[in-house]
Amino acid sequence: MPFKHALCNEIYKDWDFREACKSIRSFGYTGIEIAHFTLADEPQSISQEKRREYRQIMQDEDLTFVGLHWVMVAPPGLHVTTPDTALREKSWDHIRHLIDLCADLGPDGVMVFGSPLQRRSTGGSTREEATKRFVDGLAAVAPQAESRGVTILPEALSPQQSDVLQSLDEAAEIVRQIGSPAVQTMFDSHNAVDEVEPHDKLIERHFDLI
């Protein structure tokens, strides 16, 4: 079975959306992964009319909407594991808005949750405390994601990027802990360079969650 290829659209940030889709398709890609800040910093500011327009453009240009990524880059200042309760709740509200945007842009979308700067421990928190807040936040938004047909993918990142979820084993552990079909994980060949086990072994062990 041949792989399908999608392109992340942040390289087209200042382009007209239709022209960006035309360009992506012209290079042979069949899918598009959207960074929401290319549309608006705050997803809730995107009207339903614009969401329908974006969805129709992707259909017109024969591109499959894969999902969203770079979910915490904008607006600035967000952080999902901070001990600051007000900021943490604001940040998870942002994720809730993104879930709705993702569902409105196309069916069966995924949200790749990398964003190392906005999830790593901060404010004097330990790695364990930050990880617990991350798990609690994901568990809290999972019912909404499930009801909207969106799958959130917490991504394992190298220790140089974040101290929260540094391996596929750790990502799989929290996915199983949450126990929602709307929270799975992913295998990223770039971010897997620091894994200590062969990649094929990791994929075999966690294939049901990837």
Question: How should these model regions be labeled?
Answer:
Residues C21, V196-I210:
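A short alpha/beta connector and helix-capping loop motif
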Residues G28-T30, I178-Q184, R205-I210:
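Glycine-enriched alpha-helix->loop->beta-strand junction motifs that scaffold or abut catalytic
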